[in-house]
């Protein structure tokens, strides 16, 4: 929306005037309701919509913003929104959780490519929330459970971005 672009151009200009390095965060849990009504991150079409959106951001802000975070804390909004039900859309579903993980992981790559296409020298990344995971009392069953938790909590989004697959 042009008013939103104008607003953020003013914010970026003010940051630069004050010698503050602006950073662009493409997605920070703010799904438009019209897209959520179509399934949000559970809908594969979200990848096309996200590509178009990030392209608009890169074209409009890339001349002034060189640092971009494609997605902020993907585990928080996928787990919280699609599995635990504590963040929008507030559902509890393994199917929705896993499809959202897959689409968000792909969106990180798609968003990075969209930025790179318009801002070749951009610094591009994603903000991950991680946690230490240990097996209680080093018991085999606890160590096995800790390993599974580590995959979900720490590796699920990071390893694909690093080219290590799922």
Feature annotation, model-predicted:
Residues 1-166:
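Non-catalytic scaffold segments within catalytic domains of secreted glycoside hydrolases
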């Amino acid at each position: 929306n042009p008013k939103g672009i104008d607003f953020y151009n003013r914010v970026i200009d003010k940051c630069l005037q004050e010698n503050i390095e602006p950073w662009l965060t493409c997605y920070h849990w703010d799904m438009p309701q019209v897209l959520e009504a179509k399934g949000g991150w559970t809908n594969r079409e979200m990848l096309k919509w996200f590509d178009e959106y990030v392209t608009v951001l890169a074209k409009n802000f890339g001349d002034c913003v060189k640092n971009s975070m494609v997605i902020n804390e993907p585990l928080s909004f996928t787990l919280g929104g699609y599995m635990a039900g504590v963040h929008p859309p507030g559902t509890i579903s393994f199917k929705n959780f896993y499809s959202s993980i897959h689409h968000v992981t792909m969106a990180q790559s798609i968003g990075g490519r969209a930025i790179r296409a318009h801002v070749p020298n951009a610094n591009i990344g994603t903000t991950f929330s991680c946690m230490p995971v240990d097996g209680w009392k080093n018991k085999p069953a606890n160590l096995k459970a800790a390993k599974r938790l580590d995959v979900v909590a720490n590796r699920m989004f990071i390893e694909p971005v690093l080219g290590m697959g799922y």
